[in-house]
Amino acid sequence: MLVDSHTHLLRLEVSPEEAVREAAEAGVGAVINVGTDVEDSKRGAELAAVLPNVYSTAGIHPHNAGSYTAADLEALAELCESPGIVALGEVGLDYYRGYATPEAQKALFEDAISLANDTRLPLVIHSREAFPDTMAFLGSARVPVVLHCFEGGERAVSEARERGYYVGLAGNVTYKNSETAEAIPLMDPERLLVETDAPYLSPRPVRGERNAPKNVVHTARFVAGRLGVGEDELATLTARNARNLFGLPLEV
């Protein structure tokens, strides 16, 4: 059984129900739907309440930091009490797109880390072109951390491993000349997750199509090859890691 540890069910070409059904048929036993703003997180909590094997997170993407208010933080705190919410995120820093100033992103990130510490929920981290600052801020985190859509070579892997952080590998790890792919054997297998980030980052061999949770099988197959283990072994390993991180009621 596989777990798609990071996806966006409300942005897919098909309904969440259809996406989950297709994923189950492909061998994906659970899906983590990730929130990117308050409204998205509320809808995610509603999905988790009605769809089997779907769990959600509550968070505000750094792209949305420019409009972030104290009321949003209060809303996230309330959502964190919902039974289907298993983590806080995605939150973090993104210096690539520039949708929000670094100052606004840092203020949101600091509040999110504090809220995670208060609620004891793990953090789902978005970091793009901001790894040093991201890691500096995470020094105050007292909860488990997953670096979603992890990108980086030996040095980044070493730092994540030293801190005991989980790393989520998405479809982009399958692309040609991926520095991250070369570093997979250096990663802590007990902190390894596979994800889609659907509808984005479709893995080979479906690159160019809109991504979906079912496609996590391709990323898992690639990662298994890099580690020199069987696909079933990789599936069990990463599903167990997802269960441990998010506290999922899965038999793995």
Give residue spans per PLM region.
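Mid-domain alpha/beta scaffold segments of enzyme catalytic cores
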Residues: M1-V252
